[in-house]
From Swiss-Prot:
Name of this chain's protein: Na(+)-translocating NADH-quinone reductase subunit F
Amino acids binding [2Fe-2S] cluster: 69, 75, 78, 110
2Fe-2S ferredoxin-type domain segment(s): 32-126
Subunit composition and interactions: Composed of six subunits; NqrA, NqrB, NqrC, NqrD, NqrE and NqrF.
GO BP field: sodium ion transport
Catalytic activity entry: a ubiquinone + n Na(+)(in) + NADH + H(+) = a ubiquinol + n Na(+)(out) + NAD(+)
Main location: membrane
Family: Belongs to the NqrF family.
EC main group: translocase
Organism: Vibrio anguillarum (Listonella anguillarum)
Membrane topology: Single-pass membrane protein
Region entry Catalytic, spans: 272-389
Length: 407
């Protein structure tokens, strides 16, 4: 009898707790449709169910806000102004938003929970962002760890981007084996040396990442990207490999790939100042886009130079492109510096890190380095070294332009 009574009491307690939870949910969790008002324009308003983050809710309604990290809160690009309904700003947002900006309603869309009616403001250019399903034309190694992905835009469509701009790529959930990658024999030495073919990328949900264009606007009908494979660091091989770069490296001719855009803010200034471009690794992409745009589309007569850092001759690419531009344009020169040339390279050009090479062979004796405009994209260590060198030369922040995720 005591056992039966105990079971009954336990059951009643469980039922009571369930009822309490259901009651609390009915009071605390919003239900029914909510309205997101945008820019005070009724035609742009979104009616949706509560739940999820503002970034994904907007994307689900065809409003694509830039987010280089795919909504992880690390890039700080998905800024919107929330006038009401966004709740309190989160600590994760304060890494990217100042207290003054927060008082004005600045928020990260990826961190704002959609719980109630909201009133937000978005830049008008966001409504020009579109989504396309593209076809892979080619996906070839340009260096040991860099592929050039070339995508065909659907017939009759165009991506109205500016040089230095970027698009976002969507990758579905996937299980990709590095052993299936198409890596030409000339590049396989390092892959075998570091046992990279053992890695696999397992992703359980769709992801989005941003990549800068390597083509310029008058290379019509295509999108061209330089994508470095993000392998685990040698000192921590158990870290998962890069999700998006693994997906992109797996793409083959004829595959479909979804992109959205265009986005961007890494644009050239409309001045007559000298332009100095500095790149490394996959940071080649926006440098190529900018330089081709200046010389081929704009027919610019501005003095400009390009300084690219690579490890060895095998890691140099687009050499013929830039040699051709230099031969055709007396106002343009370019230089490559190798940090670790191989004996078979027979290299007689510049050696060392690109910031040192640029300083020792050009800026040290430049009559006014502070008057130049510097456009750079490369690995974080390169960017930091170049910026430090420029600061020591007295270059102001407004003349240092950085693409911070192309490398």
């Amino acid at each position: 009898m005591d056992i039966i009574l105990g079971v009954v009491m336990f059951t009643l307690i469980v039922l009571a707790l369930v009822l309490v939870i259901l009651f609390a949910k009915s009071k605390l969790v919003p239900t029914g449709d909510i309205t997101i008002s945008i820019n005070g324009d009724a035609d742009k308003s979104i009616v949706t169910n509560p739940g999820g983050k503002l970034l994904s809710v907007l994307a689900g309604s065809g409003v694509f806000v830039s987010s280089a990290c795919g909504g992880g809160g690390s890039c700080g690009q998905c800024r919107v102004k929330v006038k009401s309904g966004g709740g309190d700003i989160l600590p994760t947002e304060l890494d990217h938003i100042t207290k003054g900006e927060a008082r004005e309603g600045e928020r990260l869309a990826c961190q704002v929970a959609v719980k109630t009616d909201m009133d937000i403001e978005l830049p008008e250019e966001i409504f020009g962002v579109k989504k396309w399903e593209c076809t892979v034309i080619s996906n070839d190694n340009k260096a040991t760890f860099i592929k050039e992905l070339k995508l065909q835009i659907p017939d009759g469509e165009s991506v109205p981007f500016r040089a230095g701009g970027y698009i976002q790529i969507e990758a579905p959930a996937h299980h990709i084996k590095y052993s299936d990658f198409d890596v030409p024999e000339e590049y396989r030495g390092d892959w075998d040396k570091f046992n990279l073919f053992r890695y696999e990328s397992k992703v359980d949900e769709d992801i989005i990442r941003a990549y800068s264009m390597a083509n310029y606007p008058e290379e019509f009908g295509i999108i061209m990207l330089n994508v470095r494979i993000a392998t685990p660091p040698p000192n921590n091989p158990n870290v998962p490999p890069g999700q998006m770069s693994s997906y992109i490296w797996s793409l083959k001719e004829g595959d479909k790939c979804t992109i959205s855009g265009p986005f961007g803010e890494f644009f050239a200034k409309d001045t007559d100042a000298e332009m100095v471009f500095i790149g490394g690794g996959a940071g080649m992409a926006p440098m190529r886009s900018h330089i081709f745009d200046q010389l081929k589309r704009l027919k610019s007569t501005r003095k400009m130079s390009y300084w690219y850092g690579a490890r060895s001759k095998r890691e140099m690419f687009y050499v013929e492109d830039f040699d051709g531009l230099a031969a055709e344009n007396s106002n343009f020169v370019w230089h490559c510096a190798l940090s670790d040339p191989m004996p078979e390279d027979n290299w007689d050009g510049y050696t060392g890190f690109i910031h040192n090479v640029l300083y020792e062979n050009y800026l040290k004796d430049h009559e006014a380095p502070e008057d130049c405009e510097y456009y750079m994209c490369g690995p974080p260590m390169m960017n930091a070294a170049v910026i430090g060198m420029l600061k020591n030369l007295g270059v102001e922040d407004e003349n240092i332009l950085l693409d911070d995720f192309g490398g």
